[in-house]
Amino acid sequence: MFSKLCPLLRILLKASRQLQPLVSKTPQALDPKHSMNYLAHLLLADKTSNSLLGSLMGDFVKGPVDEAIPKPLRAAIVQHRRVDSFTDAHTIVKRSKNRISPEFRRYAGILIDVFYDHFLATQWVSFSDQPLNSFTTQVYAHLKQNSHFAPDKMQRTLNYMIHYDLLGSYQQMNGIHQALCGIESRLKRPSQLGRGIIELQQNHDALRADFMDFFPELIQFVEDSPVSTEGALG
């Protein structure tokens, strides 16, 4: 069933580009190393000022962080990078990536990011007292209000995320498949990433156990190493 849905998603994605964008509607290709754990980054972000937007900007701002960017945004970008480094180096995450079959091993990082966001969405009450739908509503309002700080190449992602409630859709298997199809449409080289949903189906319980072991450690890491807004130019 899932294999038939990616062509439809491509049509919907094309249609979404015709929506009134937040700033720009220029398509952007993705690198396989581009992280996709949006929900995790947003939950871990400081919920003040521009930190929610900054928690997503880490994938779109490369190199030294421009001093012209507001300090809370800079700090959130630096935290995003620290979270990614901690995640990529963690033995549990490496174990999860090794569960991915050779066919999709090149995209194991993307798949695990998205799968972990699925488990975060389905196990949300274990990590937040705020209902998920309330959280996503708050996030979308914040992103709209502060979108003028986002780089052009980030605008299409924000537009799609908000219009299609990407974060809320992570609770359902079909939502994860749609997310993978959306990523597939933006990869630099042809792939069948949408079919990667079978990796979640086949390894669901093991991957969920990995996530439930890992995420509390990530939360502790963030709490133990806060980023100061002073000199956050990493």
Label each region the model flagged.
Residues 18-20, 28:
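Low-complexity, intrinsically disordered or signal/transmembrane-proximal segments
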Residues 137-220, 224:
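An amphipathic alpha-helical core segment
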